[in-house]
Amino acid sequence: SVEERRLVAETVVRHAAGRVPVFVHVGAWNLRDTVELAKHAAEIGADGIAVVTPAFFSVRDQGLVDYFTTVAKSVPQDFPVYLYAIPQCAVNDISPKAAEECSRLCPNIVGIKYSYPDMTRIQQMLRINGGQFSVLVGPDHLFAAVSAMGGDGVVSGNAQIIPAYYKKIWQLLQEKNYEEAA
């Protein structure tokens, strides 16, 4: 429920206590709940939000742009918003053109978590805003490759279980030791 999600977000932000950035996923089954969760995340001191595409019914690019910009405009202009595409689960994919339009219309839309293993599309996302659009991947096996191409990392469930492994990969990537990182 929205109330449960609000409570989880409050608990995480409180316990993180500024030690690590907290981005709250606010995507919901409808725009009203998504906007409510986005505003709540900003109010409780989260560092930003991620918003998944609408699920179930297919939406054209303009519908996605309208959806994401509505959410982004509901929070302060300096509050970072990440788009989140996982088309294999949520039906809708975000085209690079739509992502770039979202970022143009709302400068607080700063990046995307792209969770589909389409390297061509990821390369296109990396070129948005002259390469200043943050690109995170979801599939763990793309972490090193996309980071080597200029991506900003991975959002990984596995990293919660074996963080030392992912920290080591990140350190190797920062050292540009791509062979060992892979």
Residue ranges and their predicted role:
Residues 1-91:
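Active-site beta->alpha loop and helix N-cap motifs at the rims of alpha/beta catalytic domains
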